[in-house]
C-alpha cells in the first residue's frame, strides 16, 4: 500500500516508515499537519497514518480537513495522549482505526488488512 505518515517526531517517523517498508508499504513522511494536507492536494495514498498530537494543527483537525475533501480515504489515528473528546471526534469523523502508539507496530498490519477488506466489500457493491 501507498501510505502517508504524518508524525512530528522524526525518530518515531523513521522507525515506523522502516517497519512499514519491511511489510512492503511505500511510505511518505510529513512532519506537520499542514505538510500532510499539502501532500494530499497532489497525491492520494491508499491510507493515511496520522498522529493526534501534532504542533499547530492537531491530528483531529487534519482529519476534519481530510474528510471535507475525501470522505472515503482511510485514516488510521495513532495516539498515546489523546483525550476522550479527541477520540470521540475522530470516530465521529469516520476514522478507520485508532491504535495506541506503543502498539502501532504490533497492530498496524491487522489494521491495514481490515481497511483493505472494507475496500474490497465496497468495490463489490
Regions found by a protein language model. Name each.
Residues 9-28:
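Two-component/phosphorelay signaling modules centered on CheY-like receiver
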Residues 32, 58-61:
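Acidic catalytic/metal-coordinating carboxylates
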Residues 38, 60-71:
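Short amphipathic alpha-helix used as the core "switch/output" element in two-component signaling
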Residues 43-49, 54:
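Active-site beta3 strand of CheY-like receiver
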Residues 96:
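Short, glycine/charged-rich "phosphate-handling" switch motifs in NTP-dependent
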Amino acid at each position: 500500500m501507498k501510505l502517508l505518515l504524518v508524525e512530528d517526531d522524526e525518530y518515531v517517523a523513521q522507525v515506523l516508515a522502516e517497519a512499514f517498508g519491511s511489510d512492503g508499504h511505500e511510505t511518505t513522511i510529513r512532519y506537520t499537519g499542514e505538510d500532510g494536507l499539502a501532500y494530499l492536494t497532489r497525491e492520494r495514498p491508499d491510507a493515511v497514518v496520522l498522529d493526534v498530537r501534532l504542533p499547530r494543527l492537531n491530528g483531529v483537525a487534519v482529519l476534519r480537513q481530510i474528510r471535507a475533501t475525501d470522505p472515503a480515504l482511510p485514516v488510521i489515528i495513532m495516539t498515546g495522549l489523546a483525550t476522550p473528546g479527541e477520540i470521540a471526534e475522530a470516530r465521529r469523523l469516520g476514522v478507520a482505526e485508532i491504535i495506541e502508539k506503543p502498539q502501532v507496530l504490533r497492530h498496524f498490519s491487522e489494521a491495514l488488512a481490515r481497511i483493505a477488506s472494507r475496500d474490497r466489500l465496497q468495490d463489490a457493491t
